[in-house]
Amino acid sequence: MALLTNYWMCLVTLSSTVTMGHALRRITLKKMPSIRETLWEMGVSAEQVLTELSQKSPSDNNNGTVPTPLTNYLDTQYFGEISIGSPAQMFNVVFDTGSANLWIPSQSCSPFSTACFTHNRYDASKSWTYVENGTGFSIQYASGNVRGFLSEDVVVVGGIPVVQVFAEATSLSAMPFIFAKFDGVLGMGYPNSAIDGITPVFDRIMSQHVLKEEVFSVYYSRDPKHSPGGELVLGGTDPNYYTGNFNYMNTKEMGKWEVTMKGVSVGTEMMFCAEGCTAVIDTGSSYITGPASAVSVLMKTIGAQLDESGYKVNCDTVKTLPSVTFYLGGQEYSLTQEDYILWQSQIEGDVCTVTFRGLDVPPPTGPIWILGANFIARFYTEFDRRNNRIGFATAV
């Protein structure tokens, strides 16, 4: 009886929003220091942390566990706010096109999981729309793991409420999640990427027919002093965020936000991917990632040196650095040095970090390139679920 009552209340809540029409729904995105930047300021190497994690963490073969080697939240900087439960409990989440599940820390978190206690935690006992599930949940990332159990409640994103199955995390890797500015992750990927066959949040939203179009778009401000840091738009795009027209590419494989790339050039020289390769468009990543050997050559070309926190260049040389161009759908998408250099002022002087990372993904998934937030900041990006395509337009 209690279960039916909960569902009835959910339906009443949902029905009250149907009359709002097909307006664009907006989620403000905040930009905060990444885990890597936080560790660096503490004098800790993120790479050393990952090495220690890989040595200490045993392989996990439990039911429901899906390795996600492409997802690395060390450099994630953008997140937005959602609510779960009735009354609303607020959480800051990464909207990640590289995954499809929603997870947030649980009030039932293990006392040994220190990362849980530095974040907002969902308390099922305080929500009258909570429905128990209890199925175990586990996901392994390149930078840590998340374990817990499934629950169901009302989730509100951009003013749109949906009845959603999500994961309550009872155990989070202390490194690196204890330093994360976000509470959890909301996957914007396709259903076939979801663990345990859970219907993703955006699919639940689409099923309500409250959006004008079955798309979402992501804008990241390139101005470090600009607040907010960006916006996730559900149902369409905002012409205030771009100039010219969108150029579209069909997704390479049904169910994944990835496309075929036809080359990467540095300056005027075609250097990588001339025979074609896969490019993943990933809002969960802040940097651009490519095969380690290719990124190493690229860094040598621009005179970058690798240290414990990434590739660096002499700040005096930044203005002379070449553009890096990606060839997608017959179009050229060029990043200037202003787009791929992160300029940070420190007490001891300015530091210029190159926002590229090397990552070898084995076949059949790899090798791949991952175009993250520094690419999306330059090219406003539309993710079109109805037509299974991705569009790019020059961001303002």
State where each predicted segment sits.
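Extended C-terminal subregions enriched in glycine
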Residues: 309-333
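Short, solvent-exposed loop/turn segments enriched in Ser/Thr/Gly
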Residues: 148-152, 182, 274, 319-320
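Structural signal for hydrophobic/aromatic residues that build the beta-strand cores
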Residues: 82, 93-96, 155, 187, ...
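Active-site beta-strand/loop microenvironment that shapes enzyme catalytic pockets
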Residues: 90-105, 272-301
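Short conserved beta-strand and strand-loop elements enriched in small hydrophobics
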Residues: 80-84, 151-159, 218-220, 263-266, ...
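Zymogen propeptides
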Residues: 2-165, 174-175, 194, 240-256, ...
